[in-house]
């Protein structure tokens, strides 16, 4: 199971990654009718899947595109898309997105894909959740 999601938040990792922004929060588009009415909604955090070189490159982008900080978390301009894989999905009243994913991880950095073409929460629910 995979989706193309947008990087919206980052925080420093732990251990050998403590100096690098390597813990990421990803979002999918809401169900708005147009580009003006939809928004990015956080739905998953992922920490693994990138090479050390890719992580350093993403770290540099995060430092250049930070728009706000809250505690250890940096909010970044949504410019990067990643393909995320996960083992399962369930409905969740706890999460703003309405879904919880199991074992999310980054498969690849979608440098070829614009943010506007990232997946939507509606497509995630329709494809992966039973009716």
Regions of interest found by a model, annotated:
Residues 1-131:
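Classical nucleotidyltransferase
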